[in-house]
């Protein structure tokens, strides 16, 4: 018996829907709404843009979890541990193209161009991240930041870029978006290795098990070139809690967490200055303040 289009759609989207029902922070949606303080995009267009950004973000998480061999996402089993890798890859790719289909409904000649450019950026950043990890090549801090701007900046840039197509506000927001992109990713890196809440939601220090070069580990590796401890731990892809606790202790001792916190504080105040220079934005400031609590409270 021929399956109806609706049934097929349901089967294809099941892994994606599974991820959607997990509790998320909705940071991207809040960010778009905050930027609308300046951009004043019509509500119907804004809703489509928010939907597209969320679709792409969530689809990229499905793929991320496969590429990173993750066990948990938001404290629940990753989609591919339930549905299998082939179904999840297909589901995520399907959602990318549903996102493209939605972008077409915006009816703007530049929308697809922007979509394509930002998705290429996203994949370039992601590809570099994986390459460094799997070839045991530690990037410099500058190389890492450039990669982050492609990876996190890809979707940030898409949301705000699409919004600007429907706005009279034409000021260049890229410098601010870059600051926010770095802030979000470095905060995430810090949380993965240092925050209690994160270790309850993801397996403890998952970035170490994954072998990922993140902001604190890159600092530790370059600031102590005579020691190869961190590289060796990352190379092992270890799930051993004691080794991971030792690594966190080492990062603390060589000042990598302090360096990361200071970098985050600098990015935070840089963002406030950039926001002020554009006439202020209370919603955006409130969002950044909320996200900054994590690396301040912990250490007080």
From Swiss-Prot:
Isopentenyl diphosphate binds at residues 25, 28, 57, 74. One of its GO terms (molecular function) is identical protein binding. It holds the Pfam family polyprenyl_synt. The modification N-acetylmethionine is found at residue 1. Pathway: Isoprenoid biosynthesis; farnesyl diphosphate biosynthesis; farnesyl diphosphate from geranyl diphosphate and isopentenyl diphosphate: step 1/1; Isoprenoid biosynthesis; geranyl diphosphate biosynthesis; geranyl diphosphate from dimethylallyl diphosphate and isopentenyl diphosphate: step 1/1; Isoprenoid biosynthesis; geranylgeranyl diphosphate biosynthesis; geranylgeranyl diphosphate from farnesyl diphosphate and isopentenyl diphosphate: step 1/1. Its main location: cytoplasm. Gene3D superfamilies: Farnesyl Diphosphate Synthase (1.10.600.10). It is found in: Cytoplasm; Cytoplasm, Perinuclear region; Cytoplasm, Myofibril, Sarcomere, Z line. It catalyses: isopentenyl diphosphate + dimethylallyl diphosphate = (2E)-geranyl diphosphate + diphosphate; isopentenyl diphosphate + (2E)-geranyl diphosphate = (2E,6E)-farnesyl diphosphate + diphosphate; isopentenyl diphosphate + (2E,6E)-farnesyl diphosphate = (2E,6E,10E)-geranylgeranyl diphosphate + diphosphate. Its EC number is 2.5.1.-, 2.5.1.1, 2.5.1.29, 2.5.1.10. Keywords: Acetylation, Cytoplasm, Isoprene biosynthesis, Lipid metabolism, Magnesium, Metal-binding, Transferase. Binds 2 Mg(2+) ions per subunit. One of its GO terms (biological process) is geranylgeranyl diphosphate biosynthetic process. Belongs to the FPP/GGPP synthase family. Homohexamer; trimer of homodimers. Catalyzes the trans-addition of the three molecules of IPP onto DMAPP to form geranylgeranyl pyrophosphate, an important precursor of carotenoids and geranylated proteins. This is Geranylgeranyl pyrophosphate synthase. It comes from Bos taurus. The gene is GGPS1.
């Amino acid at each position: 018996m021929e399956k109806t289009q609706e049934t097929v759609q349901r089967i294809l989207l099941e892994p994606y829907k599974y991820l959607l029902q997990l509790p998320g922070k909705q940071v991207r949606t809040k960010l778009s709404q905050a930027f609308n303080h300046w951009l004043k995009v019509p509500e119907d267009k804004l809703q489509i843009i928010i939907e597209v950004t969320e679709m792409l973000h969530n689809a990229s998480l499905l793929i991320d979890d496969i590429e990173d061999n993750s066990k948990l996402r938001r404290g629940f089993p990753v989609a591919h541990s339930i549905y299998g890798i082939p179904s999840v890859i297909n589901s995520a790719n399907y959602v990318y193209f549903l996102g493209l289909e939605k972008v077409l409904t915006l009816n703007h000649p530049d929308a697809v161009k922007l979509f394509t450019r930002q998705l290429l950026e996203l994949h370039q950043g992601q590809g570099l991240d994986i390459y460094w990890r799997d070839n045991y090549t530690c990037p410099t801090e500058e190389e890492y930041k450039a990669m982050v701007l492609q990876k996190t900046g890809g979707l940030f840039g898409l949301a705000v870029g699409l919004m600007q197509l429907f706005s009279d506000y034409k000021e260049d927001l890229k410098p601010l978006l870059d600051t926010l992109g770095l802030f979000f990713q470095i905060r995430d890196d810090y949380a993965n290795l240092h925050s209690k809440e994160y270790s309850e939601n993801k397996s403890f220090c998952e970035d170490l098990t994954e072998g990922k070069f993140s902001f604190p580990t890159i600092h530790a590796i370059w600031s102590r070139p005579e020691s190869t401890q961190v590289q060796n731990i990352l190379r092992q892809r270890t799930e051993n809690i004691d080794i991971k606790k030792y690594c966190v202790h080492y990062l603390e001792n060589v000042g990598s967490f302090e360096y990361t916190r200071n970098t985050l504080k600098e990015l935070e105040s840089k963002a406030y200055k950039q926001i002020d220079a554009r006439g202020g934005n209370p919603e955006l400031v409130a969002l950044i303040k909320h996200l900054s609590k994590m690396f301040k409270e912990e250490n007080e």
